[in-house]
């Protein structure tokens, strides 16, 4: 895949740190990481120049994940298969399993089927949360198609989400207690993040610190769990498992920040959903929070209104675009991206490490 094609794919299909960074504008958008390696981290890992994009690095393993997903959703109750397949077949770039696979191979992992199975579990959990999120939000579309909730109804979609959680642990349950516990912990964080987000729905008192806590749990949990499990199963030293976790955590936060920005400045044809959905739903997204903190009346009015009109939403979006919130949000997303890259530099050189670096860059470089 060429770089431009990869960017286009991310634009079409992307819809989910330790401490709080200060928001500041960066003089350069370049994200760099040097090639320093922690002593003792060197393993026999193949170097393959010219294939640094994350897709080609793990394309064969991702195909195995796809095959697992198809098998996983088969059921005697055809409605379960039909509803799950409706979302699984609608696309998505499988970023969470990609992180898991890249981390595993970057640390010298050799047992492909093992990591494919846990990557499948993580994607099944993510898919389950999407089904449940669409119910919570009353979403009519998902990935450019009618949402499962809209097409099949609340009850069947809810049960299908539960079904996918169960299937996820059929895969995760094959591993040792540590992996199972980390996977369960990720599910706990997801649910906590959803509840915490609800506390700040249409609440102008929400802060950036509150937002980060939501994102760490709701979005970043599967990213950092996938990276951590990948490193652990590859046999990495505990200090390097921590670095992998830091990579996933910071990348997941940056990912959500960019997603929030695109909800304001993106295009429906590329996003597969209307822009301004966070304002419509009252979600505490980063550009909205920053605009509310700045005291913008249009944003405050639309955010606090239980049923904002399209005119109110459009006025708020225009105000956010012309204010400083988008630039501040971009700056903060790049700050977290750089933290992810700091963790990557501790890995031994390989195409997989390069893939992890490129994945961060692709997320940050999505066109605004």
Give residue ranges: language-model regions.
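All-alpha prenyltransferase/terpene-synthase fold signal
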Residues: 2-368
